[in-house]
Amino acid sequence: MDRIYQGEEALCIHNAATGRELKFPNIISKSKIKKKIVVVGAGPGGLEAARIAAERGHEVIVFEAAPDPGGQIRLCAKSARRKDMMGIIDWRMQQCIKKNVKFNFNIIAEAQDVINENPDTIIIATGGMPNLELFETKKDLDNVFTSWDIISGDVKLAENILIYDEAGDHTAMQSAEIAIEKGSSVEFMTPDRLISSEIMGMNLTPYLKNLQNKKITYSIAKRLIDVSIKGNKLNAVIGSDYDENFNHSSTYEQIFLNYGVKPLDELYFNLVSFSKNEGEVNYTKFINGETQNIIKNKNNKFNLYRIGDAVSSRNIHAAIYDALRLVINL
């Protein structure tokens, strides 16, 4: 509902067809030809692809590296504020089970694993991993953590920390809440002109209300340029997009990045040469939910696609919407 206060249409994170019913009906039609579909990844995008494919009447097999479905949603649901997000996964799992989707958990699928299933279509929905490469340095920082580390509880938090938020999404705010609850003093820094630019008002307000009078300071229009070790602390070089002469340093005990994710796309590229379409998508047809028809090598046996964060760092709705547009006429 946040979107309507910014002059946008009302959409649903859970159901990408909501608000788009004229183009994408909620009732999925059956396919005239039954196909075998392999989906790699059981996050929101992968499960939506599996659900719709099964509704279409296809045989569907899902590979998932983790022991449970959910992907990044399972991580975000660790925060009490967002625990209900698991409903996105639970409902899709229920629907997939009803339609006899086969799940293979605890398997890091290799190219040969999916090829051996003799599929007609392979959909890569493997998501991504936190990005540690600052644009300015062109290298991964090996002396920092990510916001995922705070939410998962994998890192013991120090007293004085920096959360650098380039993505502007819920993850950084969740991290700040958790860090403060555990006793840390937080500087929340963003290169943007306002904090959490991807969180709209109705959702941002509860975060800000909870963080009032807590040990947090907000630093806007400041960009993290580089990080180096200085004694037993970290030295952050800080600049600004608004003043090329602005440059100073600050020290912290720990630095956490919220910098989006890098696609886990190795499997996709390993499969490209074996596919009919060489992984290519007709984006005009994709946007309109029309059947893909690109054939680059007719001697190969399957078509290959990728969705969600396996393409580029985005959000839950984007992954689900990708799945809907790709599979609704598959």
List where the protein language model places each region.
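Acidic/polar residues at beta-strand termini and the immediately following turn/coil
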Residues: 15, 228, 237-241
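Short acidic/His/Gly/Ser-rich catalytic and metal-binding motifs that mark active-site loops
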Residues: 20-23, 69-73, 132-133
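Cysteine-cluster motifs in flexible loop/terminal segments that predominantly coordinate metals
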Residues: 1-33
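Generic secondary-structure signature for well-ordered alpha-helical cores
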Residues: 2-5, 17, 97, 101-102, ...
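Surface beta-strand/loop "capping" patches
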Residues: 25-37, 161, 224-236
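Rossmann-like dinucleotide/flavin-binding elements
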Residues: 31-65, 104-118, 125-201, 241-254, ...
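Short low-complexity, flexible loop/linker segments enriched in glycine and/or proline
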Residues: 75-79, 118-121, 138-140, 201-205, ...
